[in-house]
């Protein structure tokens, strides 16, 4: 009953946001870099924040530093969806939020170099998640796969967080998917959505890694990770400014040049990541070997795909 109430309340909150976004003209207009062709409401992913907030309010205010950190990144990302903010301003908010999250993790009891590594990794993951949010269904669907895996791991493998937290966030993702995981999306996640869900997943995966002392759990983000990193390398090889928008991700070429429906592309990413996670859980004793093998396999598939189809992008 608790989750049904949460689901209904989040659904109503999303509908209320649509009215606000429509009235305030918070929209995403298509351009030459877009993978969509119609004006669509932006910022629907703000519901992820409200999912985390709902858990916080019903759990005797658990994880206060994390919630404060999430509030910071959600706020600056939402502002950025409305009007562009400076890069230094965003970095200040993000770094401040990450420091708070590290404190919630208990990371400051470790050596200082762990903090540096965590800052680099977390910044990279948040940016990657933001870059990968470009077609209908991909952010919500991919996040749903990871959250479902985390719920299973938390129950059957090792307990690293209260289960209600994961399930409440899943409710928010289901609400978003109802409006976004379709041919004609009612809304896009916006920076507020992609950044906030990335931050939530980082918090959960970070707790899992700290609890087990095993960094190979990062395999949960391997598909996004390989696509993002290799696309950056590819653009550097093409002497492009990697700070500018583009349409060179593998999923973008599938959707734009190969004309594969957005939902199909998103489903492929979901399925591949789900298969990888199942394989990892079956090979828990060989986590790092499995991670290395998966990265090599994904890199090989990425390179083969680009060799065959990138010419289509160059000709457009």
Residue map of PLM features:
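"…together with the soluble PPM/PP2C metallo-phosphatase catalytic core" -> "…together
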Residues: 1-229
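C-terminal membrane-associated helical module and adjoining short loops/tails
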Residues: 210-316
């Amino acid at each position: 009953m608790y989750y049904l109430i949460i689901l209904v309340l989040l659904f109503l909150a999303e509908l209320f946001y649509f009215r606000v976004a429509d009235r305030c003209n918070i929209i995403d207009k298509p351009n030459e870099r877009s993978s969509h062709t119609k004006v669509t409401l932006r910022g629907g992913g703000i519901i992820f924040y409200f999912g985390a907030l709902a858990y916080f309010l019903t759990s005797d205010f658990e994880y206060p530093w994390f919630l404060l950190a999430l509030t910071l990144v959600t706020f600056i990302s939402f502002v950025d969806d409305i009007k562009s903010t400076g890069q230094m301003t965003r970095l200040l908010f993000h770094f401040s939020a990450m420091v708070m999250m590290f404190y919630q993790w208990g990371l400051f009891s470790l050596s200082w170099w762990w903090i540096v590594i965590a800052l680099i990794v977390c910044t990279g993951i948040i940016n990657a998640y933001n870059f990968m949010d470009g077609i209908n269904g991909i952010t919500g669907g991919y996040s749903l796969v990871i959250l479902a895996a985390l719920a299973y791991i938390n129950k059957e493998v090792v307990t690293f967080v209260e289960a209600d937290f994961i399930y409440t966030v899943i409710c928010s993702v289901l609400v978003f998917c109802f409006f976004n995981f379709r041919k004609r999306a009612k809304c896009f996640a916006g920076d507020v959505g992609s950044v906030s869900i990335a931050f939530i997943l980082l918090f959960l995966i970070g707790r899992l890694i700290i609890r087990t002392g095993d960094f190979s759990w990062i395999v949960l983000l391997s598909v996004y990770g390989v696509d993002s990193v290799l696309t950056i390398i590819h653009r550097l090889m093409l002497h492009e400014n990697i700070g500018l928008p583009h349409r060179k991700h593998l999923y973008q070429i599938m959707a734009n040049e190969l004309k594969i429906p957005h939902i199909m592309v998103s489903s492929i990413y979901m399925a591949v990541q789900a298969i990888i996670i199942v394989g990892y859980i079956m090979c828990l004793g060989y986590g790092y070997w499995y991670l290395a093998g998966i990265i090599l396999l994904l890199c090989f598939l990425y390179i083969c795909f680009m060799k065959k189809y990138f010419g289509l992008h160059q000709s457009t």
